Amino acid sequence: NIHENETKQRELGFCEKLMSMGHSVLKLDMSEPLVEPEKQIEKFLLEHSTIDGIFAINDFMAIKVMKVMEKFGKKAPQDYQIIGFDGLRNAADQTYLLSTIAQPLDKIAQASVKLLLQLISKEKAVLSRVLLPVYFAEGGTTKKNTEIT
């Protein structure tokens, strides 16, 4: 499954970078299909109550983690920091509520249309895998560099 591989690459890259900077990494791996993810998240966070930084594999999972942390009386970014992945926001003109690694949706759309047109015209597909740059989109769930001690 290509999506699983890309998701694993996402996780691996993030963990490798943290470890190269001297940070320890604890991982909660949940198998799909997800069954009661909030309960798994709650159990993990209870077992590791000193966690102060979280990378969620996507923005939806980050929101689930934030809901669990709210149950514990913790708020981001005061008590912990969290970064999602995908660049979720309600509308293009809104700011990000969640700090996230955002994907260039316009470039994704362009590459998708190009591939689709190749398939429709029965051309040999030139694009099978496209790597596009991502960027950090600051939301309200991480501290600014000046706030980090």
Regions found by a protein language model. Name each.
Residues 1-149:
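Bacterial carbohydrate/catabolite-sensing allosteric modules
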